Amino acid sequence: MKQKTSTAMRLRALVLSVLLTMPLWVLAQISGVVVDAEDGGPVPYATVQYKGNRISAVADGNGRFRIERHNGWRLTISSVGYREQVVNVNPKTPAQFTVRLSSENRTLSEVTVKSKKKSRYSRKDNPAVELMRKVIANKKKSDLKSHDYYRYQSYQKIGLSLNDLKPETLEKGIFKRYPWLREQVETSQYTDKLTLPLTVDEMVTEQLWRKDPKAERTIVKGTKSSGVNDLFQTGEILTTVMRETFADVDIYDDYILLMRHKFSSPIGRDAIQFYRYYITDTVYVGADRCIQLDFLPNNQQDYGFRGQIYIIADTSYQVKRCELYIPRSSDVNWVESMQCMQEFSKQENGEWLLTIDDMIVELMLTDFIQKGVVTRTTRKTDFSFDPLPDSRFKKKNPLQIEPGSDSRSEAFWQEHRQVEFTKSEAGMSGFLTHLEQLKGFKYVIFGLKALIENYLETGTREKPSKFDVGPINTFISQNFYDGLRFRVGGQTTANLNPHLFAKGYMAYGTRHHEKYYNAELTYAIAPKQYLPQEFPVNNIIFSSKRDVALPSDKYGINDKDNVFASFKVHEIDKMFLYNTQRLAYEFETSTHWRFSGDLKTERIDPIGSLELKPVALDAAPLSKMRYTESTFGIRYAPDEKFINTKQRRRTTNKDAWYVQLQHTIGYHGLLGGEYAYNYTELEWFRRTWLPMSWGKIDTRLRLGKQWNQVPWPLLPMPQANLSYIVHPQLFNMINNIEFLNDRFASLMLTWEMGGKIFNRIPLLRKLKLREILEFKALWGSLSERNNPYLQQNQSSTLLMNFPTNSYIMDGKKPYFEYAIGVQNILSLIQIEYVRRLNYLDLPTATKHGIRFTITPTF
């Protein structure tokens, strides 16, 4: 009896287990039926597959199929004679649905008929153009910012892989020696090519919006990175640059910033003039009947897309699906192909909003370097338009990073990951371990770090570097006083102390056997991850320096000892030996306000033909002069974003405008200071993108005034570029200390046209050259109180005679120069012809010049 009871209980438990797990099994499956879009009849034996993931199924004779559910993957349904259809599987994809396939023959026939027409494209009485006008007119219906509030969650995965590996390659060389490397290779679900994933990065954010008062917030809830970028301390630069370069696309914007270029949107305000449109078919996208509209730019080398837009076939004129491609003849560098696929989903309130945004960019630097592919997938979910409490907007920083966002648990990622990892992506950690065990691999990484980061690390991934040696490109340089110059330096990192940082160098000049040094100690009030300049700064800095430099070196962005910038276009025989001690405080807010203040005492000794000669006839030249000053500055750059290199912090979004104001006060008698003065300077920068792919114009304005009587070393000097390297923010044809003013205004305009003209010249079109024009102007004047040549100033105890070949500008005659250049020579080189327009009668004036730089960019 007991045995029968026990058997019955086991049977009931088994049945209960099956019943409980059956819903989970059903939810993990997708089933459907494939039908002909025209007559609704079943399409038998259609192929249903996740391309690149080796999971597939075949529909039965009635068109019915069943396949595993993999959220974030692309399900492709195809059959002979029909156009394949792709379904982006996500949590909202129903467990059962109908797939309607359009006949390939009918569509091809229509396209063939159209292609045979030789008639000129016309916008007048063109139904495709009229349809697009209605789509553009109804754009506001999908504008999230028309709501008083919104919130949604965004998941993004971005990866970098080696691309287009050949099957024969996997059977020889390193792949044959290391089977684990061959196992890392997979087939891309987007391109069907063999790829080797190298990095994969994830980010989960919450997007918030309030219309009144206007506020927008991005809250980073989780980030995760794995792959070869973990081998580099600055590896997050790769992730940041990829996110900036291959950013999310919003076709409802007028222009789309992608790969450092602005592309005209196919539904932007200038789209009708920029693109050609053709209605090609009526198809089903999912369950929605859509009008397929193909488009391409008038000139396919302009920065525009070709592709298809699928518009809901009703009076809403909303976009259901969009496929964007960069034409093969496009002017973009190193991109073999780019495709961006977007899908819009109907929300409960009836709006069509972007929920799926995938981008695949195949890269090719040269024929002999392995190709790469960047894959970026974005999913937007959980849209809500309910009012948000003011507390969600209390913090003013538009980008907020939750504590612990970079160390979320696996449970967090299982909950928020909208796109499943492939086998190779999931095994990235083991792949990295295998790589590090390769013989000689650590030496390869050491060399790559030196090349990429310009510093030599003294640690490993297991024991991170506490001290980095560099910059490498300053180890050897030259100048007229030192001759050949040797320098060695380095800096501590947060691995030694996250608050206290030291950096500096020792240098030696071979001609006069002079020794120099620079030592800097920084206390970061907020702990840093690696270096003290990480945003936002809240630092106290003390530095001491003894070194030679040109007066204009303070305006340069690069280190003055950069070996490439140490060769000058003019003969240099005037320098100063600086002996400087400085105490500074720098503070940045999360809203990108920057406040700074310092106290500096500096002694300068003239070198070469430079003299510090007072105007009094009986006065002897001075061997030195000392001044003590404080500089207080404020800077605002609300849209700036950064990456942290080991040398400096760099702005990633060059479109960000800024304005800064600083005032300097000189103290007589403080720390040996011999002069009292006030100097004010204002700088403003803005980038303007021109419509219709006419490029961009950078505008830079600077104003400055010295309010007191001072010797000439304390007067503002023109920002002169004395090297052969292009510097857009410096004057190319002004010599060392050529003009001395006590008030000035400078305007610099740079117009990068992006090949707009060259692309229309048949012989130049294939070279993908790009035009650049520059115009620079300087207005300056010298007040009577600072003019050493006036009789009334001959008894001054402050003024000094100007150096040889230094001049006073005519206040009614601004200085002008321009440059005409060619960018993108061999996809790397920029060469400019620079021309000085006036003040040519001065003995040191040079009328013409050539400048160059290497600027790798898309």
Identify the meaning behind each predicted range.
Residues 29-43:
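Structural motif
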Residues 54-64:
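Short, acidic Ser/Thr/Gly-rich low-complexity loop/linker segments typical of extracellular
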Residues 46-50, 75, 113, 152, ...:
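Hydrophobic beta-strand segments
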Residues 40-44, 66-73:
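Short Pro-Gly-centered beta-turn/loop motif in secreted/extracellular proteins
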Residues 261-263, 395-858:
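Exposed, low-structure sequence patches enriched in small/polar residues
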Residues 35, 47-49, 79-80, 97-144:
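Short, acidic, small-residue-rich periplasmic hinge/interaction motif at the N-terminus
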Residues 50-51, 74-87:
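A short, solvent-exposed loop/turn motif at the edges and junctions
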Residues 117-290, 296-304, 366-470, 474-477, ...:
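Structured extracytoplasmic
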